[in-house]
């Protein structure tokens, strides 16, 4: 980054500091990952200069012959990965992908059935502070009070009672497999559309390690980062019958020109996801998550639903007599990055919470293995149990440093 260093020392310094943070800390935020250098090169390419309103072959600007190739590559690779009939790779985020689906099939005030945010849903699944909860009449379903797994009988009962036009499946903090076939059966029974937000599990689906929602849903949305290990962005997969409507909802509906440099980076990441070693990577994510969950339970920590089927683990910290906010802060102090998170049947404020959400996608990208999960579980428990003991926290910092030093990353940067 010689040019940046000469041009803008302040921004260069901030980026260098962030690189240092990523290298020196254990990244356990479930929605984060480390992209390849190839993905970063594509995102930092000259494609950032190109305006390309419209779609390949139907642009509102000239000079789009090369970016058309890139967007077609991205779309074709997604179709190959997930078996989708139609793909739109232009959404700038998962939230905008969800918005586009809503704008395609809903009118203001329509009833939608979505997962309660504190039970594992997402802001765009009907939270009253989000456009989705403001524009539409969302009815919430949640998890069982004992198992903390989705109660499909409750979903069916609420669907029959409220007759939603759309049912939203998918989550941002749900550690178990979701039965998309069952959701489609419920949707069909009440005459509703089904949209699946697979943002967190897309990489696992791509590797064939989680049920694929595409055969069951009218619409599937996802981010392109998280377990899919691409750049930050979104996309929509849908049945061919909705293709023109979805494309129109994205452009000119809610977006202008697509970010072609990001779409190029998406294409590269999708190419990586088609390789055999990506399947190995995704399996290692799950193996690491299971090992980490087992280690945390051995240390006496409570896990929502008792474990995990995917990359994500939700820790209930109430038995440690601390809050999620305190847990996030003290873990960050020793070099372990997590996020505080609400848990099912939460009583604390979302700014405080009773839980911590962690995931294994990023550490697996870095090369961490099963024995490293044992050490991370020990570190998390040791830190939380000794959160007011500075000597213990200093010991934890040294252990984190020893662990991260074994896995150098982005050495060419």
Swiss-Prot record:
It is found in: Cytoplasm. PROSITE patterns: SHMT (PS00096). (6S)-5,6,7,8-tetrahydrofolate binds at residues 117, 121-123, 239, 349-351. The record marks 225 as: Plays an important role in substrate specificity. Its cofactor is pyridoxal 5'-phosphate. One of its GO terms (molecular function) is pyridoxal phosphate binding. Its main location: cytoplasm. The modification N6-(pyridoxal phosphate)lysine is found at residue 226. The keyword Cytoplasm applies. One of its GO terms (biological process) is glycine biosynthetic process from serine. InterPro entries: PyrdxlP-dep_Trfase, PyrdxlP-dep_Trfase_major, PyrdxlP-dep_Trfase_small, Ser_HO-MeTrfase, Ser_HO-MeTrfase-like, Ser_HO-MeTrfase_PLP_BS, SHMT-like_dom. Its EC number is 2.1.2.1. Catalyzes the reversible interconversion of serine and glycine with tetrahydrofolate (THF) serving as the one-carbon carrier. This reaction serves as the major source of one-carbon groups required for the biosynthesis of purines, thymidylate, methionine, and other important biomolecules. Also exhibits THF-independent aldolase activity toward beta-hydroxyamino acids, producing glycine and aldehydes, via a retro-aldol mechanism. Belongs to the SHMT family. HAMAP family: SHMT. This is Serine hydroxymethyltransferase.
């Amino acid at each position: 980054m010689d040019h940046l260093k000469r041009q803008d020392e302040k921004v260069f310094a901030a980026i260098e500091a962030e690189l240092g943070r990523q290298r020196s800390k254990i990244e356990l935020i479930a929605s984060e990952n480390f992209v390849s250098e190839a993905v970063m090169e594509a995102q930092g390419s000259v494609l950032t200069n190109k305006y390309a309103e419209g779609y390949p072959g139907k642009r509102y600007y000239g000079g789009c012959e090369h970016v058309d190739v890139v967007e077609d590559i991205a779309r074709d690779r997604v179709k190959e990965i997930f078996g989708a009939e139609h793909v739109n790779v232009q959404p700038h985020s998962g939230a905008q992908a969800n918005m586009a689906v809503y704008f395609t099939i809903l009118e203001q005030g329509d009833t939608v059935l979505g997962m309660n945010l504190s039970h594992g849903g997402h802001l765009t699944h009907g939270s009253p502070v989000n456009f989705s909860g403001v524009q539409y009449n969302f009815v919430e379903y949640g998890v069982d009070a004992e198992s903390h797994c989705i109660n499909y009988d409750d979903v069916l009962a609420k669907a029959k009672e409220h007759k939603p036009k759309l049912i939203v499946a998918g989550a941002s903090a749900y550690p178990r497999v979701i039965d998309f076939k069952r959701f489609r059966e419920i949707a069909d029974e009440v005459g509703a559309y089904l949209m699946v937000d697979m943002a967190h599990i897309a990489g696992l689906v791509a590797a064939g390690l989680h049920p694929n929602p595409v055969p069951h849903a009218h619409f599937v949305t996802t981010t392109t980062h998280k377990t899919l290990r691409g750049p930050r962005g979104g996309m929509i997969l849908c049945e061919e019958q909705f293709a023109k409507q979805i494309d129109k909802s994205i452009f000119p509906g809610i977006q202008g020109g697509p970010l072609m440099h990001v779409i190029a980076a998406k294409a590269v990441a999708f190419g990586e996801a088609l390789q055999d070693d990506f399947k190995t990577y995704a399996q290692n994510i799950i193996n690491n998550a299971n090992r980490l969950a087992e280690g945390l339970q051995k240390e006496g920590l409570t896990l929502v639903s008792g474990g995990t089927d995917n990359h994500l683990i939700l820790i209930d910290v109430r038995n440690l007599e601390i809050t999620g906010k305190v847990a996030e802060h003290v873990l960050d102090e020793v070099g372990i990055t997590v996020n505080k998170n609400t848990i099912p049947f939460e009583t604390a404020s979302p700014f405080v919470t009773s839980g911590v959400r962690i995931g294994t996608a990023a550490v697996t990208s870095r090369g961490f293995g099963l024995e490293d999960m044992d050490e991370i579980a020990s570190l998390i428990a040791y830190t939380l149990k000794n959160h007011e003991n500075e000597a213990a926290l200093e010991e934890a910092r040294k252990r984190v440093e020893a662990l991260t030093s074994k896995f150098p990353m982005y050495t060419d940067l």
